[in-house]
Amino acid sequence: HASTGNLGHVVIPPDELTTIRAEEAKKAGGLAGIEVIGGMFDDLNIFDGNKAARDKLVDVIKYAQPDFIITHNPDDYMPDHTAVSRLVFDASFAATLPNYKSGYEKAAALVPIYYMDPLAGVDFQPTEYVDISAEIGLKLKMLNCHESQLVWMKEHDGIDFSDMVKTCSKYRGYQC
């Protein structure tokens, strides 16, 4: 996750929420054995075309040496999501250049980028499908670790995010 999530709550102040969101992400990642790297930018302070932001993501990519990248859809609803999508696209290429200056020497491989569904899958036509039947339970357990965000989505947007994930996942299963 690129953002601290510091603005995403009705009651919890930003500094406190930053800590909570980082702990929730670490807990969720721990369920799947994932090292969580993130919280590089405050909410609504992520802008595409920003070299410093791109360079932070270049460092993450060069550090992780991924086999593939999953990022936000370029047409998502949230300005941070669309900016991250573009920054990841740009950084994924820059990270492959051996002479591109960064905190890591080893260049990353040029790998596929996969875009997630935007919120509720609106106006998105997948070109590839992955059967997540065996992982949906873990996915939901990981999602439920993000308690402060689930509460925020319910209170701010009226969205039961857990139900939406189940519904959208089932729909994509039928679709393929």
Model feature map: region roles:
Residues 1-64:
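Active-site rim/loop-helix segments in enzyme catalytic domains that contact anionic ligands
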